[in-house]
């Protein structure tokens, strides 16, 4: 957030442009965007592919102008690679590149996609976005933390102790079985387990 301050401008630092997040569906890119907006104290402006495609080139220009006018904010461009996949793709790309290079508003763009190779290479060159991050599958410790967090919604034991209602051996079995699960899949796993237990009680 310090990079948006007048002090940063006085030091000659450029305004941050934004980041690209690459990862499989369900890896937590949307959650990351929400947390980033929260940390910056900026409202999140969700710009989906439907919004861009339905309005066309002229509406996209208007949208970027509104984003500038409503700054500070965090524009969130989901399924970013699909923005440039049709006959208007080159025009949209040119408009966005110009805006990124010339913008003077306190906006921080987060663009997400599943595969970086689907993105026009112009967008990953220096001076476009500040960073490209890969959001990978959660590791073993992270999987346990995610499961414990979601299980605690249904059973307070998971919030009150290190292992909740399970033994260490049971946790090890679950962690091994959930290798390459996304955060979304782990959340659904906790919900499915709770529903199964409730159906047995009923």
Language-model segments: which ranges?
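Conserved AAA+ ATPase small/helical "lid" subdomain
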Residues: 133, 157-202
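Walker A/P-loop NTP-binding motif of AAA+ ATPase domains
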Residues: 1-172
């Amino acid at each position: 957030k310090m990079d948006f301050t007048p002090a940063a401008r006085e030091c000659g630092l450029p305004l941050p442009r934004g980041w690209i997040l690459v990862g499989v569906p369900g890896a937590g890119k949307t959650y990351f965007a929400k947390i980033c907006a929260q940390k910056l104290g900026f409202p999140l402006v969700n710009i989906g592919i439907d919004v861009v495609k339905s309005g066309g080139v002229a509406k996209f220009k208007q949208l970027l102008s509104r984003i500038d006018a409503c700054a500070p904010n965090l524009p969130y461009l989901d399924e970013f690679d699909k923005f440039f996949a049709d006959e208007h793709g080159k025009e949209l790309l040119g408009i966005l590149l110009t805006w990124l290079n010339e913008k003077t508003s306190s906006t921080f763009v987060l663009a997400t996609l599943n595969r970086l190779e689907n993105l026009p290479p112009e967008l990953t060159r220096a001076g476009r976005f500040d960073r490209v991050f890969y959001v990978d599958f959660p590791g073993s410790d992270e999987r346990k933390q995610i499961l414990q967090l979601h299980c605690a919604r249904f059973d307070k034991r998971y919030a009150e102790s290190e292992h909740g209602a399970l033994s260490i051996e049971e946790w090890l079995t679950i962690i091994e079985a959930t290798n390459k699960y996304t955060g979304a899949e782990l959340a659904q796993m906790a919900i499915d387990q709770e529903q199964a237990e409730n159906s047995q009680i009923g």
